[in-house]
Every structure is written in structure tokens, then in C-alpha cells.
Design a protein with these regions (language model features):
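Peptidoglycan glycan-strand catalytic modules in the bacterial/periplasmic cell-wall system
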Residues: 75-285, 301, 307, 466, ...
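Non-catalytic structural connector segments
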Residues: 144, 279-337, 341-402
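Active-site SXXK
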Residues: 112-114, 272, 346, 455-456, ...
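Short active-site loop at a secondary-structure junction
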Residues: 98-103, 437-446, 469-488, 501-504, ...
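Short, well-structured active-site flanking segments
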Residues: 122-132, 217-219, 279-284, 494-518, ...
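A penicillin-recognizing enzyme superfamily signal
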Residues: 336, 340-356, 387-452, 457, ...
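Conserved catalytic neighborhood of penicillin-recognizing serine enzymes
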Residues: 141-167, 229-232, 296-307, 498-564, ...
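N-terminal type II signal-anchor transmembrane helix
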Residues: 2-82, 120, 357
Length: 828
């Protein structure tokens, strides 16, 4: 304090000396001299005040943008997302703004803007003192108020938002002072803008930042929103409508107030006549024309591939944070792998098939409620449970915390709701919340993805049947893959030296496994989807094609469940896997995207390439700031991959193959090899199909939003009936399009000398009709495998020992077999 006191005393003396000197200026002077001194003093004080505001003297006025920030000023811009074929498929934005250059705008707009908003624009340097004096005079004389802000001042206000984004300091807390500080800062910024930018640049920046209402920021978005044209295509009358809105975007909005907008448009046109930018004859003609709009407000959810775009946003979130970008304001150009034409084919295929699936589902259940448990009993409180997870229920609970009757009343009170309909899209009905939930949960859902195995590029992505109604993306939803998981069982078998022509017996067997939930050993036995075992030794190629569960589980034990899980992870499965014997039948949840990536590893000769959604990103200045790397890794031997390619093709060629119906869609394209694998989880809750060719891998899933909602029979609910046709319709369109001729190719001959045709070219297996014989079946069960809690075999029992725990005769499905008929081979 002792050091500060002398400084304060010195400052006090200097201030007193200044005021003494200033008073002496007036003494003995003429009145006009005193007047001049007063005026000069005010001018000096004004500029000293502006300087103090600019430098935030003693933190009294708050921070202001510096010269560098003004010179390199940037605005919030929408990021654009492009397809691989160069089509703009959507935007990410908070304010829908896409900048344009001065030359990209019709000159009529510039003329209308200057003539109306700032007629002395080319004469002032940011502040129009003539206009300011006129505005003061009008205010004093109570005339109609005129705007005193120049275009440059408006730009300063729009771009830097002094009223919201910057503090007004300690003095800003005083009543009436805050607005003075804000206006002062806008004047200072306007002057700096004139010093750092040309008039043309200022006009362009203004046109790109100004708000035209309807979430249209900037001239490009406004022209698209109101007239569905580019700024270059604007006519004089259209330009006048947009300029007229700048005075008050709501009051003069052509949608909200068409009469006001028309009157304001004609005022703008008359201003153009007054300044010689429009002839009287042109005005007389144009002013009689009604405003013709092609109005369409653009949202984040316009365009195509909505689920894909959400996935891209999720993927880029971390990249944006790490690289100091904002996806919704940084004006990035994002180039993706999706092909707009293939996406269109995929969406059409999904809707075409799902309409039929929904018809089958509705006919199948009739008036019954489909949310049933495994014993076919309606699940009590199912709809109520869904309702309690809805925002409306949480709102009602907060409003009526101790009044459940009121909550129930409002949940069951009819009101207008928006629902999905296949024929009409979004429909509006008078319905209660509970009834709308009942209506919507009856829908079956789907997902689809197409991927290039060599690049990992995702070419088509369908997350569900309608984004507006169901925003949850089923491509990344976790569901049981069923028999599609057998790919990894057989791949590991190939890794360990087996071949497609090696045989395993289709027979009943059981095993003791440790059930962690019950904390004890239980007996588990796999069953085939057709309900019986042939007892035949079947080539692995046929067992895979027919999706025989007993062989898959036996192989799982031979190869080791842990090894199979490791192989699955190497090939592209990222989700955790429960290493139990049932894993061989697809008991652990995974998603369609990672499954397609793993199947791509087989198509790519054993080389794993992580799926790619974004190829490159360019910033607002045209600089490339991201390029997707191509990381390829050989994760399974080429020999295993080649043999699995043959196995997959067996699914479409072997007698009884579950994927044979794919030939009905792609059979005419004989220059292309296709393999496939179907899958159906327990109770037909999840139906899958994966299709593989050398250059393209496709996958589809079909099921209910909740696992308890499903078909009751494999004849309707299996993967070959529900999911496969989506891929089939898609492939018909793609392979028939000359633009995608590159996808029409064959796998070719083996590249390794140690691969012989005898390994995969074996005689087709034809399932013979088998007599029902307990003795014969018992012969096939020669041993029982007992596993510890980690799934490892610990002991083996003979057939005689087995009877102590329960003979095959006691197993309900051990001997049952139907007569020859169409059956589902891909159920768990």
C-alpha cells in the first residue's frame, strides 16, 4: 500500500493540473472561441472514449475483436456432405448458411440492396454521418424514423454479435450505458472493416451473413428457400422481395405476411427506379406481378441417406474435437463413400420387400397382440412399459407426481399424432398415446449395408424403413446373428487344416456346461432347425450351405470356442463375444456393419480393411484437412479365405442351400460369382442374409423393434424369406446398371499351389429320408462332452454312462423328423 499511495497522489496532481489548464483556455476568450474550444473538446473526448472502448480501458467496456479477428472474420457456415459420385446429399448446420462469391449473385440484388439499405455506401467509410444527422432530425421532429445503420455497421452486428458474444464491461451493468457501449463497438468494428476489406468484399460478407427468416442465412440459402433457385438466377422482383425482408424478416415475410411483403417489394423497386437502376416501364410491369414462391425450408434431415449421415456425424465428432472444428458451424465439405445411385437402389429394395414382410406379419398375427413370450403368452404391461420410457410420460409424472389417474387419463386421451404408413408416408390421426404406441410397435424393421471389400467403402446404408418415425439406426443395433456367425466357425476350421470336402456327422450329442446365471452345470444339446438328425457324414461344404447346427457346434468344440472368437475379432467383429458353446450358433449380439466388414475379409482374400465412411474433408478455404488412410492387414491365410469363398458359393449352389433363392435375383448375371449365408436367431426374432462377391458385399437384417415381436414360424420369419430379398432386389438394380459394371466379376482360380480342386470340388450331398429309429439315433451319440466354466472339455462319458443323466430317447427333439418338405435350416 505504501508503494501505491505515491502513484495515486501523483495522478491526483496531474488531473487537477489538467483541469486548471483547461479552465484557463476559456478565460478572456471571445464567445465564438469558447464555442470552437467546446466543439473541439467534444470531438477529442469522443475519440478518446472510442479509444478507451476499443482497448477496454480499465476493464470498463469489455473485450472487442482486434484487427486480426476482423481481417480474418469467419461466420458460422453449414458443413456439406457429398456422395462418392459428387451429389450433395445433406448438410449439418445450426444456421443454414453456405457462402457465395460476389460474381455468383445477380447484380439486381446488389443494386436493390444498396438503393434501399445504404444509398451512400460507396461514399462513407463505415459510418454514414449524413444519415446519422438525418435520423436524429427525424427523431426530434417526430417524422418517420429512418435507418441510420450502414451496410458495414449491419455486417459488424451480424458477424460479431456484440450484444450476445462480447461483454460490455463494468460500465455495461449501468442502465442505459450498455447499449451505448454496444453501438460504439459496432461503429469501431465498421470502421475497421472498411480499412481491411474492399467494398465488394463487405457486400459479399453481408449477403452471406444476413438472416432472411425461415432458418435461411445468407443469400444462397434464401434464394433456395423462397424461390428454389441460385442467387445468380434471381430476378429483379425476387431480389426486391429478399431485400425488403431485411427491415423486418417476420413482418415482411412473403409466407407469414404476403401483403406486407408485396408492398415492401414495390418500395424496394421504386428505390431502384429513383437511383436509375430500374426503368419506370420495368417498374410499372413488375410491380403488378404477384409474388410467386417455391417455398421449402431446408432442415438437417433433408436429402438422402439420413441414417448414414447420422453415422458420419457420430464418427466425426471426436475428429472435430481433436482438430478444433465444429461440424455444424465450420463450413466443412465432407466427401463420403456412399454412392447416391446405390443408396437409392437400397432404399427402394428395402421398402419393396418390407411392404411384403409387413403384409405377411399382419396376416400372420391377425387381431392378436404379437408381443408374446416363448410360451406364446401375451407379455403383461408391455405397452405400458414402453409408454413409461417416453418423454410425455416423464412430463406427466413431473406434473402429476401423486396422481396416477391423471397420468393414465392423458395417456389415453385422443389427440393428433403423426404415424408411419407405407403408402402415404407420414400420416396424421386422432389417437391416444397408448394406441399410437400399439400401432407403431406392430411394424417390422430392417437394415441394409453394401460394402466394397478391397477398400472398406460403404456404398449404401439403410438404417430402417423411415427416419422420421424411427431414428434408431438398425445397422449398428446389437442383435443375435444366428447362423451367419457360422462363417467364423468354418473359417477357423479351415485355419486348422480342414477343407470343404472333409466330413462331419450330423448326429445328436449333448454337453454339460457351466451356467453362470444358475451357478451350476447344466446339460445343453444343439438341435437342427428341421428337428431331426440324419446320422450321415456330411461334407462341410454341404453342412455350411444347409446350415446344420449339429455340425457347427461339433466343429466349435473341435476348433475351440476361444480360437473362433479370436478369429471373428480379427476378421472385423468388434463387439465382445460370450465364449460359450452356443457362440457357434450366433448367440452373442453383434451388429450388421461389423458383420459385413468381417464377410468382406473373406471376399478380400483374407485381408481386413476397416470400413470407411469418409474419404476426405476440405475446410472452408479449400484446404484438405483429412484423408482416409487405407490400412490393410492379412488376418487369415489366403487359403482359408479362398476355401470359405467356395463354402459361401455353396450356399447358393449346393442342394438344400439356404441361400439358393438368391439365384432368382442374380441368376441372369452369369459373369458374377455370388455366395451367401442366411441366419435366424431364436424364435425368429432376427433374420439375416449376407451376400458375398469379389467386389461387393451386402448384408440385411429384418426383425421387430423388440425381440418379443416376431413371426412364429420359420416359413415366414427365416432369413431367406425376409432379409435375402432385400439384397436380391438391390443386386438386381446394381448389376443391371451399366454404371456399376465393375462389380460383375468372378472369384477366379486359387493363387496358391497347395490348394487343389479336391479340397472344395466334392460330390454334392443329397439328404436322404431317414427312418425314425431310436437305436440308430443312439448309435450316433457315442459320447458326451463335458465343459468347464471356460468352455474347455474336461471329461468324456461313454454311451452307457450317458444314460445315467438321460438317454437320447428323453430328449424331445432327438429323433423327430418330418417327411420331405421345405424347412428352415438357419434357425438356432
Amino acid at each position: 500500500m505504501k508503494k501505491v499511495k505515491p502513484i495515486l497522489i501523483w495522478c491526483q496532481k496531474k488531473v487537477r493540473a489538467f483541469f486548471t489548464w483547461y479552465r484557463n483556455l476559456y478565460r478572456g476568450r471571445k464567445w465564438y472561441t469558447k464555442t470552437l474550444i467546446g466543439i473541439a473538446s467534444c470531438i477529442v473526448a469522443f475519440f478518446l472514449y472510442l479509444g478507451a472502448v476499443d482497448i477496454n480501458f480499465l476493464w470498463l467496456f469489455g473485450k472487442s475483436p482486434g484487427f486480426s479477428a476482423i481481417k480474418e472474420a469467419v461466420t458460422s457456415e453449414a458443413s456439406e456432405i457429398y456422395s462418392d459420385d459428387g451429389v450433395l446429399i445433406g448438410k449439418y448446420f445450426n444456421e443454414n448458411r453456405t457462402p457465395v462469391e460476389y460474381e455468383d449473385v445477380n447484380p439486381a440484388f446488389w443494386k436493390a440492396l444498396i438503393d434501399t439499405e445504404d444509398e451512400r455506401f460507396y461514399k462513407h467509410h463505415g459510418i454514414d454521418y449524413t444519415g446519422l444527422v438525418g435520423a436524429v432530425k427525424d427523431a426530434v421532429l417526430h417524422h418517420d424514423a429512418r435507418g441510420a445503420s450502414t451496410i458495414t455497421q449491419q455486417l459488424a452486428k451480424n458477424m460479431f454479435r456484440m450484444r450476445t458474444n462480447y461483454s460490455t464491461g463494468l460500465l455495461g451493468k449501468l442502465p442505459g450505458v450498455r447499449m451505448l457501449i454496444v453501438k460504439s463497438k459496432e461503429w469501431i468494428i465498421a470502421t475497421k472493416l472498411e480499412m481491411t476489406h474492399s467494398k465488394k468484399e463487405i457486400l459479399t460478407m453481408y449477403a452471406n451473413t444476413v438472416d432472411f427468416g425461415s432458418n435461411a442465412f445468407g443469400i444462397k440459402t434464401a434464394a433456395k428457400t423462397y424461390f428454389n433457385c441460385s442467387p445468380k438466377e434471381l430476378t429483379a422482383e425476387q431480389a426486391a422481395v429478399l431485400v425488403g425482408m431485411l427491415k423486418a424478416t417476420t413482418y415482411y415475410n412473403p409466407i407469414a405476411n404476403p401483403k406486407n411483403s408485396l408492398r415492401r417489394r414495390n418500395i424496394v423497386l421504386s428505390n431502384m427506379v429513383r437511383h436509375g437502376d430500374l426503368t419506370r416501364a420495368e417498374y410499372d410491369s413488375i410491380s403488378q406481378i404477384d409474388i410467386e414462391l417455391k417455398y421449402s425450408v431446408e432442415s438437417n434431415y433433408d436429402g438422402t441417406a439420413l441414417y448414414f449421415r447420422e453415422a458420419v456425424a457420430d464418427e466425426l465428432r471426436k475428429w472435430c474435437n481433436d482438430n478444433d472444428y465444429d461440424l455444424y458451424t465450420s463450413g466443412l465439405k465432407i466427401y463420403t463413400t456412399i454412392d447416391s445411385r446405390m443408396q437409392k437402389y437400397a432404399e427402394e429394395a428395402a421398402i419393396k420387400q418390407m411392404k411384403q414382410v409387413q403384409r405377411n406379419f399382419n396376416n400372420h398375427w391377425g387381431n392378436q397382440e404379437p408381443w408374446q413370450d416363448e410360451r406364446h403368452n401375451v407379455i403383461p404391461g408391455f405397452i405400458e412399459g414402453i409408454a413409461k420410457r417416453q418423454p410425455v410420460y416423464k412430463y406427466l409424472l413431473a406434473r402429476f407426481p401423486n396422481n396416477p389417474d391423471s397420468i393414465e387419463y392423458y395417456l389415453n386421451r385422443p389427440h393428433k399424432v403423426k404415424l408411419f404408413d407405407y403408402e402415404q408416408g407420414t400420416i396424421e390421426r386422432e389417437m391416444s398415446t397408448m394406441d399410437s404406441i400399439r400401432y407403431m410397435v406392430h411394424f417390422m424393421h430392417c437394415s441394409f449395408v453394401a460394402m466394397e471389400p478391397q477398400t472398406g467403402a460403404v456404398k449404401a446404408w439403410v438404417g430402417d424403413i423411415d427416419f422420421k418415425s424411427w431414428k434408431y439406426d438398425k445397422v449398428t443395433a446389437m442383435r443375435q446373428p444366428g447362423s451367419t456367425f457360422k462363417l467364423f466357425v468354418y473359417t477357423e476350421a479351415m485355419n486348422q487344416g480342414l477343407t470343404p470336402c472333409d466330413k462331419r456327422r450330423d448326429e445328436y450329442f449333448s454337453m454339460k456346461v457351466f451356467d453362470k446365471a444358475q451357478n451350476k452345470e447344466v446339460t445343453w444339446a444343439p438341435t437342427n432347425a428341421n428337428g431331426y438328425f440324419t446320422g450321415d457324414s456330411i461334407p462341410l461344404k454341404a453342412a455350411f450351405a444347409r446350415s446344420i447346427n449339429s455340425v457347427a457346434v461339433r466343429l466349435g468344440q473341435e476348433m475351440g470356442i476361444t480360437r473362433i472368437a479370436e478369429t471373428a475379432h480379427k476378421m472385423g467383429i468388434e463387439s465382445p463375444l460370450d465364449e460359450t458353446p452356443a457362440l457357434a450358433l450366433g448367440s452373442s449380439d453383434i451388429n450388421l456393419l461389423e458383420l459385413a466388414n468381417a464377410y468382406s475379409t473373406v471376399a478380400n482374400d483374407g485381408k481386413y480393411v476397416k470400413r470407411v465412411l469418409v474419404t476426405r474433408i476440405v475446410d472452408r478455404n479449400g484446404k484438405e484437412v483429412y484423408k482416409a488412410p487405407l490400412n490393410e492387414e492379412q488376418v487369415i491365410p489366403y487359403k482359408s479365405a479362398f476355401l470359405m469363398q467356395q463354402m459361401l458359393m455353396g450356399g447358393t449352389r449346393e442342394p438344400g442351400g439356404t441361400s439358393m433363392s438368391l439365384n432368382g435375383y442374380v441368376g441372369n448375371f452369369r459373369d458374377t460369382d455370388w455366395g451367401g449365408k442366411t441366419g435366424t436367431s431364436n424364435n425368429h426374432s432376427d433374420a439375416w442374409f449376407m451376400g458375398v462377391s469379389p467386389k461387393l458385399v451386402v448384408g440385411a437384417w429384418v426383425g421387430g423393434e423388440y425381440r418379443c415381436i416376431h413371426f412364429r414360424t420359420g416359413a415366414l420369419g427365416q432369413g431367406s424369406r425376409t432379409a435375402l430379398p432385400i439384397c436380391g432386389y438391390f443386386l438386381q438394380s446394381v448389376l443391371g446398371d451399366p454404371a456399376f459394371a465393375k462389380y460383375r466379376t468372378k472369384f477366379g482360380k486359387p493363387k496358391d499351389d497347395d490348394i487343389t480342386s479336391a479340397m472344395y470340388n466334392c460330390q454334392s450331398y443329397y439328404m436322404r429320408e431317414k427312418n425314425d429309429s431310436t437305436n440308430t439315433d443312439s448309435i450316433h451319440v457315442e459320447e458326451e462332452i463335458v465343459l468347464d466354466e471356460n468352455g474347455a472339455p474336461i471329461e468324456r462319458h461313454s454311451a452307457t454312462e450317458q444314460t445315467k443323466e438321460g438317454s437320447p430317447e428323453q430328449q424331445p427333439n432327438a429323433h423327430k423328423h418330418p417327411k420331405e418338405e421345405a424347412v428352415n435350416f438357419d434357425d438356432l
